[in-house]
Amino acid sequence: MFTASFEILDERFERLIFGNVHLEKLYTGCRWAEGPAYFAAGKYLIWSDIPNDRLMRFDETDGSTSVFLAPALNHNGHTVDREGRLISCEHRGRCVSRIEPDGSRTVLADKYQGKKLNSPNDAVVKSDGSIWFTDPSYGIDSNYEGDAAPSEIGACHVYRIDPASGEVTAVATDFEKPNGLAFSTDEKRLYIADTGATHVKNGPRHIRVAEVSADGRSLGPAKLFATCTVGLFDGFRLDTNGNIWTSAGDGVHAYAPDGTLIGKI
């Protein structure tokens, strides 16, 4: 166990941390750890080890770590829906799927307008049951984290899966490589990371935010929220006060709702 190191950039960050907090290494041995999701009812955490094609599970009750699923179709991001089921973004499956508590799998979306998705990356579930996900090309760019293949869609979009019909609609089409995403606490805004700098010189390395329409089915124009100062943003979540906690190249960055970088872990 190691004492956490904090960089305080704004007094608002001081109210979010405690001096006796520790960072604890839960597991080592992944080639590439990604996409954590916590099951509060079962007190366990799952995450992807993408190149090793497996999902791992850490049990909070006894501190043990085990393989949750292997092979795993190179899963990337995950979230838990309102019924406590695992929603998965599959690189090799090129789909968004749902895994029930009994282990059964249902493909929720694998095509848009008759064309295969690229390689879904991250997903969030809205309170109305709709699933919103990003679809960059990372899983089809090479065989390292999926199966190399050309993009049938020819672009990287953000999509919504309708909870009643299952229809897949594009809600944002002006991102280079959409990545992590999360709703504001009132679900009136959707924050989306763009990691296009991995493929385009001086490309995007930021989070943008878009207003959700009144009917909850579409987005307005996405505006710049924050630019990553070290590395790239990837996955992130909001706390109950609307602060964003996001991965970055030198740790976890915390942003206030107004877009100010207030601190780092």
Regions found by a protein language model. Name each.
Residues 50, 91, 136-138, 195-197, ...:
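Short loop/turn segments immediately following the C-termini of beta-strands
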Residues 133-153, 193-203:
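Short, conserved, GDST-rich strand-edge loop motifs in beta-rich repeat architectures
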Residues 20-22, 28-43, 71-90, 94-95, ...:
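Beta-rich, blade/repeat-based domains predominating
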Residues 54-56, 95-97, 157-159, 206-208, ...:
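A short loop-to-beta-strand structural motif that recurs across blades of beta-propeller domains
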Residues 15, 40-70:
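Beta-propeller domains
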Residues 22-27, 63-69, 106-113, 167-172, ...:
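A short beta-strand motif characteristic of beta-propeller blades
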Residues 209-217:
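Short loop/turn segments immediately following beta-strands, especially the blade-tip
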Residues 1-22:
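Blade/loop signatures of beta-propeller domains
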